[in-house]
């Protein structure tokens, strides 16, 4: 006898389709998050950004979440409004911030009145001794960096809101089933966005033989549009699930200020929070500057543009091999009874990873070498 399917989440295919929608949205957001990291040197040469300006712009992503406590408000919104509303809202906020950042990096911004305003304002320096070092704006920053930081702040709000919303959505669809595997799979797919960014950001910035850094950001904005479409599709899919179950959208108990007291007095909360702080303080800042660090400390000789290793086609070949690594290692987790197939897939993934590393070495660029890191 076969199990009777009662609702969408009782179907493994529909459950994993919902997960794929959420994971792809996060994948797109992770691509945009580090879209300028592999082309920091190009931002310096074409837009006049120095390392301090670049660092403040990158740090702007978390400014509102951490120092204005927006992430706490995002959690309250999620509790009050539910997964569907918050998912679409987060996608829209990410896209809004991404568009601002794209405009800041584009040639259209140069010479405008808005550029003049940002040049003459937000030049904070020593007059704010306590919070000055953490502000996204400072004296000496190019106007494009200031506006990009403003857009990145909005993007960061949407991205972190999306992160907690996706986790909530996975629990809703996989509760009582393979929840841990689903969460791990979502995070694995999302993290591939970092490798995608490292490979394709320089590719689009240099496409056509000329440097146009806004093309790389445009690529990220297009993916943010895809992310919003994924969230909207999930919205209707999740709504259909609630119609089948005859329940209103699942929401938590109303927020009470006393809940914050219970949270901050929990030892488990602080252990998990400190673990996350250590992880994020080590990994994310490293990703922002890793490519430039390799460029400054390694004597790299890029391949001749007239050869295969220096051409555009190798970018796509290397990315396809990366997908083989990801697909082989990921699919092996689902093989339980056929050990030969399981180890065969793992072997293919290992061989593909070796080829991937070799291609990164032969291309001779810092971004292709660092692209191994997310895998």
What are these regions (language model features)?
Residues 145, 151-189:
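Cytoplasmic helix-loop-helix junction between adjacent transmembrane helices
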Residues 2-12, 242-273:
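Juxtamembrane intracellular "pre-TM" segments in multi-pass secondary transporters
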Residues 339-375:
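C-terminal transmembrane helical hairpin of 12-TM major facilitator-type secondary transporters
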Residues 214-234:
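Symmetry-related core transmembrane helices of the 12-TM Major Facilitator Superfamily/SLC fold
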Residues 68-125:
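Conserved MFS/SLC helix-loop-helix module at the cytosolic interface between two early adjacent transmembrane helices
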């Amino acid at each position: 006898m076969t199990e009777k399917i009662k609702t969408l989440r009782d179907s493994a295919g529909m459950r994993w389709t919902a997960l794929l929608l959420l994971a792809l949205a996060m994948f797109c957001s992770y691509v945009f998050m580090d879209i300028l990291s592999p082309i920091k040197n190009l931002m310096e040469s074409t837009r006049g950004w120095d390392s301090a300006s670049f660092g403040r712009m990158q740090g702007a992503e978390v400014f509102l979440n951490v120092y204005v406590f927006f992430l706490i408000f995002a959690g309250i919104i999620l509790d009050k409004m539910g997964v569907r509303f918050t998912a679409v809202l987060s996608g829209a906020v990410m896209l809004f911030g991404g568009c601002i950042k794209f405009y800041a990096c584009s040639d259209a911004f140069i010479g405008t009145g808005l550029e003049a305003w940002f040049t003459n304002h937000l030049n904070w320096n020593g007059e704010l001794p306590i919070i000055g070092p953490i502000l996204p704006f400072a004296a000496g920053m190019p106007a494009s960096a200031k506006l990009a930081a403003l857009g990145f702040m909005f993007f960061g709000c949407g991205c972190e809101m999306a992160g907690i919303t996706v986790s909530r959505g996975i629990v809703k669809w996989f509760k009582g089933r393979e929840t841990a595997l689903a969460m791990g799979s979502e995070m694995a797919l999302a993290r591939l966005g970092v490798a995608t960014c490292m490979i394709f950001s320089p590719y689009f910035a240099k496409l056509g033989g000329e440097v146009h850094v806004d093309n790389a950001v445009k690529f990220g904005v297009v993916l943010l549009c895809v992310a919003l479409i994924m969230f909207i599709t999930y919205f209707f899919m999740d709504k259909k699930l609630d119609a089948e179950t005859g329940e209103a959208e699942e929401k938590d108990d109303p927020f009470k200020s006393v809940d914050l007291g219970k949270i901050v007095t929990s030892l488990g909360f602080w252990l998990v929070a400190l673990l996350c702080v250590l992880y994020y303080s080590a990994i994310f800042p490293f990703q922002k500057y890793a490519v430039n660090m390799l460029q400054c400390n390694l004597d790299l000789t890029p391949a001749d543009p007239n050869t295969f290793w220096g051409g555009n086609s190798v970018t796509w070949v290397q990315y396809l091999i990366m997908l083989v690594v990801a697909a082989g290692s990921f699919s092996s987790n689902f093989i339980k009874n056929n050990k030969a197939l399981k180890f065969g897939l793992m072997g293919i993934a290992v061989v593909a990873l070796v080829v991937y590393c070799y291609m990164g070495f032969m291309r001779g660029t810092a971004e292709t070498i660092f692209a191994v890191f997310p895998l």
